Amino acid sequence: MTATKQHKKVILVGDGAVGSSYAFALVNQGIAQELGIIEIPQLFEKAVGDAEDLSHALAFTSPKKIYAATYADCADADLVVITAGAPQKPGETRLDLVGKNLAINKSIVTQVVESGFNGIFLVAANPVDVLTYSTWKFSGFPKERVIGSGTSLDSARFRQALAEKIGIDARSVHAYIMGEHGDSEFAVWSHANVAGVKLEQWLQANRDLNEQDLVDLFISVRDAAYSIINKKGATYYGIAVALARITKAILDDENAVLPLSVFQEGQYGVENVFIGQPAIVGAHGIVRPVNIPLNDAETQKMQASAKELQAIIDEAWKNPEFQEASKN
């Protein structure tokens, strides 16, 4: 757990497009004092090169130790961030990645735990809700110390899309996407607000959007990744900054409320899955979920989303290899 020492150490596992963008975001924002980057042996030199390149920005930002790391370096880390995994290709859903990325995740988590690591896992590889669950299972860690990026990026996309339509700074638009980080996610329209004014009331007063506009807006948010992947091959800047925000909340013990993939223990009638909902996060991980009162339609969407994730998990855990590796 973090905040037990003044030195703030992050280990990044995976130096691909997401990982390297995350590392750049940490440097730009002056987050963490030490950053180790782990890559597979055949890409070790890339990690060395990225560490060197990033270090050349430190004179413009703040001091930080940056280096190509090994799993042994995880032993005294505050936070291990997992971005490594097979990338989502055009035409693939995040859930299509399950088989490939569960095996990768098992190898990573096993080696991190064997180092003596006793901090917090932050998972961003897709499908993130399933891989957050597998990180919890393979690590044996308490659920509070295994966190997925969840719907943090989706919620940011939602806020920005609304902000652009109504001409308001996105930081003054408060709205959440909940559920799976993927096709079954949903917008929590019942609590969306602009500077404390319910979105419904705002729209009645300003007539910025009609009902069909809102439907189209949500679809554009839900399908944003597919659109970007078709245009440029991958998404990485948005999720990198989302991960940096979560990292700062943990290292600085902010007790910030962020939409993350967190373990469900009956809230919304859902159990035994990690799924996107707001939660308080600080130096010890998840302090507690924030159970926003959903209306009936939203609750049904949450349950349907969880059911899809549960089916994927149940199918995956028929694999004896994953059963044997489970510690939770």
UniProtKB/Swiss-Prot annotation:
Q: How would you summarize its activity regulation?
A: Allosterically activated by fructose 1,6-bisphosphate (FBP).
Q: Where does substrate bind?
A: 88, 94, 126-129, 154-157, 235
Which amino acids does the record list as binding NAD(+)?
Answer: 18, 39, 46, 71, 85-86, 107, 124-126, 149
EC identifiers of the protein: 1.1.1.27
Q: Which GO terms describe its molecular function?
A: L-lactate dehydrogenase activity
Instruction: Kindly tell me the pathway this chain contributes to.
Output: Fermentation; pyruvate fermentation to lactate; (S)-lactate from pyruvate: step 1/1
Annotated source species: Streptococcus sanguinis (strain SK36)
The protein's name is L-lactate dehydrogenase
Gene3D superfamilies per UniProt: Lactate dehydrogenase/glycoside hydrolase, family 4, C-terminal (3.90.110.10), NAD(P)-binding Rossmann-like Domain (3.40.50.720)
